[in-house]
Design a protein with these regions (language model features):
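Terminal ABC-like ATPase head and other globular end-domains that cap long coiled-coil arms
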Residues: 1-127
């Protein structure tokens, strides 16, 4: 459902477990497509949705719950609509602490922490 939300219903992901191998199918408007056929923006949405989907599966299967998600530079490959939809999805998730690492992305509903490095010392500053 994550990819359907990120792509306004155009794409969906299917996870198939064969033995110990997890196969991921990308469906574009009802037809299976290869990942190489995707644009960089579509590829970014597929990657992000796959990460969120696997995290959810692991939470269902695991006895201990993962409540931490770090997304490093995922916003750079998403268009403005994709960024907004991802923030909406993340804000709806329950019991998760999400950190989005980005050099360019800002959102009014997200708290911002600036990290600067001077003389080998990193400083954190919350806004």
């Amino acid at each position: 459902t994550y990819l359907a939300e990120l792509s306004s219903g155009r794409f969906q992901l299917n996870f198939n477990l064969k033995g110990e191998k997890l196969n991921i199918q990308i469906i574009d408007e009802g037809r299976q497509v290869e990942i190489e056929a995707l644009s960089s923006g579509e590829f970014g949405r597929v990657n992000t949705a796959t990460l969120l989907g696997i995290r959810k599966i692991m939470n269902i299967l695991s006895k201990s719950k993962l409540n931490l998600l770090i997304l490093d530079e995922v916003m750079g490959v998403l268009d403005d609509e994709g960024k907004e939809k991802l923030v909406e999805i993340l804000l709806q998730e329950e019991n998760i602490n999400t950190f989005i690492v980005s050099h360019e992305f800002e959102h009014p509903l997200l708290h911002k922490v600036n990290i600067t490095k001077e003389s080998g010392i990193s400083r954190l500053e919350a806004e």
